[in-house]
Design a protein with these regions (language model features):
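Short, aromatic/basic amphipathic alpha-helical patches
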Residues: 220
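A glycine-centered loop/beta-turn motif at secondary-structure junctions
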Residues: 148-152
Length: 220
């Protein structure tokens, strides 16, 4: 029989990328119902001894997330460093990275005159995991889901949350897809161990990561 169900993203989203662009981590997409409907689902699953695993996308958010809306208001906004903003170089992007979805991994913001990083679409700005306030906000959100009763998380592209220090160019001319600069970087395990301590330790839960570009020998 069924022992667990993994829900692909059901959070509030404008659906630019099938729900992997989250607008609100603590609201259910209207197409799927309400938070009360979610609580009913979770309760009925647990009555039947079925676990519920949520998809979690914390490499990036939607550009319609409240954090990003605040972040792009000004250079000194308290949420500015929740995302990765950089000055351009000679009127062009901060580096030559391409994204999974677009020729350049950077989009220009006219209002503040800086570029923001998005390893996927321009509708999915990357979160800045070097900012401890961002990490604390993510952990608090995860713990609220655990307190609600969810049994674990499947973590989308979690191996991409740490970028190479200084965001150096990839090797080659033009736009370059450079996973060696944004996948499985030195701080990745530091962040994941901190997450384990803050969210998973002491709980009867599970976690599985989509670890893009990571090989079995890299496991630690």
């Amino acid at each position: 029989g069924v022992g667990a169900v993994w829900l692909c993203p059901v959070y509030d989203s404008p659906n630019a990328d099938m729900g992997y662009d989250i607008r609100d981590y603590e609201k259910i997409m209207s197409e799927f119902g309400t938070m009360e409907d979610f609580d009913t689902l979770l309760r009925e699953m647990h009555k039947r001894d079925i676990k519920l695993v949520m998809d979690l996308v914390v490499n990036h958010s939607s550009d319609e997330h409240a954090w990003f809306i605040e972040s792009r208001k000004s250079l000194d906004n308290p949420y500015r460093d929740y995302y990765i903003w950089r000055d351009g170089k000679s009127g062009k992007e901060p580096n030559n990275w391409s994204s999974f979805f677009t020729p350049s991994a950077w989009s220009y913001d006219e209002k503040t005159g800086q570029w923001y990083l998005h390893l996927f679409s321009e509708k999915q700005p990357d979160l800045n995991w070097e900012n401890p306030k961002l990490r604390e906000a993510v952990y608090a959100m995860m713990n609220r889901w655990f307190d609600r009763g969810v049994d674990g998380f499947r973590m989308d592209v979690i191996s991409l949350i740490a970028k190479a220090p200084g965001l150096p160019d990839g090797q080659g001319d033009g736009y370059v897809f450079a996973p060696e600069q944004f996948a499985f970087q030195p701080k990745l395990h530091e962040y994941l161990r901190e997450m384990r301590r803050r969210c998973f330790d002491g709980r009867n839960c599970m976690c599985v990561g989509e670890t893009t570009f990571v090989q079995p020998e890299n496991a630690d």
